[in-house]
């Protein structure tokens, strides 16, 4: 949330392409969701001896309750629905594992994959172009895009292979979290399919934007504040908001801090 500037997203600079929320809305939402994420970790610990899929199924009622808490805290604004799903799963995966394993991001995300195996097929089994109702269902029916379900089922490759190494390489260069995190966000956006961008524009625009960002990052892997602010202005002009990539950035931060703490404990 506080990484700034984040093109098209709520941050300390502005509300991005969102007229119904600001950084304080996000703070209210995050505070309301803290008990949920703790409950997810506890659920993971309590079901650690059972099949991973059972932990995931046990999370779903908690997630529904958390969405209600979020909406109550924000006056009906959806700030963190994606994070309720993805961050909740990662917290439960951490709960299932011995603390000594937290230093290994790949192991944590392998547990995420085990928990959600078969999720995409199960949730989209009966989806067709005719009956697709949600944005996710429509994108799956038209393009075969699996969105966040596909990401978690695959062990969040956009986090493990893109976000985390980009963030940590930037920090190693001496950049602060604004610049290293901004670079990680753009790398995720360039290297994965952000369904929020498609929903606010088109598949063609999302693909073109990804290619544009790949070219930018080849030349400047960590754009400075002015460059990020210019991108922010462009995204707002087009009403673009990479919300899916923002959730993946949040997971990148979570795993960075968890794995760093785990390695420091050794």
How would you describe each model-predicted region?
Residues 56, 76-77, 81-84, 102-105, ...:
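Alpha-helix N-cap/helix-initiation sites
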Residues 237, 241-266:
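Short, amphipathic C-terminal "tail helix"
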Residues 39-95:
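Long, hydrophobic/aromatic-enriched structural stretches that serve as scaffold segments
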Residues 5, 13, 60, 73, ...:
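Generic detector of intrinsically disordered, low-complexity, polar/charged segments
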Residues 1-52, 56, 94-233, 256, ...:
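Phosphate-rich cofactor/ligand-interacting catalytic cores and adjacent structured alpha/beta frameworks
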Residues 68-81, 173, 233-242:
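A short glycine/serine-rich beta->alpha loop
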